[in-house]
Amino acid sequence: FLNAKSGVHPDVVRILADFLNNEIYPLVPRHGSVGASGDLVQLAHIALALIGESEVSFRGEVVPAAEAMKACGITPLRLRIRDGLALTNGTAVMTGIGMVNLAQARRLLDWAVKASVMLNEVVESYDDFMAEPLNACKLHAGQIEIARRMREICASSRRLRKRETELYSGDTGEAPTFKHKVQPYYSLRCTPQILGPVLETLEQAEKILVEEFNSVDDNPVVDQIGRASCRERV
């Protein structure tokens, strides 16, 4: 609506802001289709609350929307031309769900990186698998970034071993005897290559979601001089 291409009345934007500022949250069913031709069912429940119908979450309780609005001095929305369709025919719900899932996925990735460092510490791996010169040989941004994060996490670790210290001490006397694995466990030393593509996928997902979040998703679209044009939803 803020791009001024939906043709809604300013009261629509005002009441949405009033709901957010007063922490009034419309109750929306957990189950129901999204994205077929807009998130019709879910957005309709939000629109119901704006006109004083349905129920909302307010101050930790589920109450009628009209009651919460009265307590905050908010007048129920009076729908004008274009308001009803604009409120119900969009992708706001699935975009919001996508944003929440993205935030949770980023948190899981962060935990996975930290857990990988911990596992390498448990088995006393050599730390060169995450070295900057090694990972810079591959031009995959995700791999390079995951390796950097791992180095940052284990910077003060006393459990990871240095290959140059244990295998190449400079002693030319007796032939060296390998007392530990020459390389860490395969699944552990390949963490940058495994989690790197995950990071790149999340970066691409964020790009798409941010673009959708800031897009005009309406039909018809009204330009700033008042002309309307219809389009097929994509």
Regions found by a protein language model. Give the residues of each.
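Active-site cavity-forming subdomains of large catalytic enzyme subunits
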Residues: 1-140
